[in-house]
């Protein structure tokens, strides 16, 4: 089903503009951008559930995607009180070698800085951190509302939400672009 739908999207997009890049996701990464206390029941991130280089290569061949988002220990959403499970960096390297395409990390929120940097060095070129950004926005909005509970003007409430998002984005941009710094 995933292959069929992804191939349809690729064909449609390329018929409109062949220069538009299409990204495809393979493997179980979850489906919700939310903050969790623990892994949902029945969900376990086991090595045998992650995308293999062979599966990735076949998916790319059958769909024609320009970028690939494989399951490599990542999960949509993030945990409240602990980092997400570790990314399989060796698997990222092997998939990159097999598909020879840019790799995308879906479900990046909650991963450690070390995992991000190692994943980028192994071949990831795009990192999705949507839950982390949404959480910063929500916390900023809540702070804006609680600091003046009678305020109703959005332009007076929203600046803390925007600052929260800006802080996360700047922090991640700095991290993602400091690849020459040795890993500790």
Task: Describe each model-derived feature in a short phrase.
Residues 1-99, 113-129, 135, 139-143, ...:
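Alpha/beta enzyme core
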Residues 102:
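Active-site-adjacent substrate-binding region
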Residues 105-107:
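Thr-Gly-centered strand-to-loop micro-motif
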Residues 144-184:
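Extended, intrinsically disordered, low-complexity segments
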């Amino acid at each position: 089903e995933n292959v069929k739908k992804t191939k349809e999207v690729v064909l449609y997009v390329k018929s409109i503009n062949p220069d538009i890049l299409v990204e495809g996701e393979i493997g179980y990464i979850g489906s919700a951008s939310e903050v969790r206390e623990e892994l949902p029941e029945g969900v376990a991130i086991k090595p045998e559930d992650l995308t293999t280089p062979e599966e990735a290569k076949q998916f790319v061949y059958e769909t024609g995607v320009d970028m690939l988002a494989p399951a490599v220990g990542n999960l949509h959403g993030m945990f409240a009180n602990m980092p997400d499970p570790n990314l399989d960096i060796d698997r990222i390297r092997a998939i990159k070698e097999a598909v020879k395409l840019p790799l995308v990390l879906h479900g990046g929120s909650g991963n450690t800085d070390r995992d991000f940097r190692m994943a980028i060095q192994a071949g990831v070129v795009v990192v999705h951190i949507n839950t982390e950004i949404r959480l910063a926005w929500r916390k900023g909005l809540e702070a804006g509302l609680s600091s003046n509970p009678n305020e109703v003007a959005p332009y007076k409430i929203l600046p803390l939400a925007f600052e929260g998002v800006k802080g996360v984005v700047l922090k991640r941009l700095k991290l993602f672009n400091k690849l020459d710094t040795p890993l500790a």
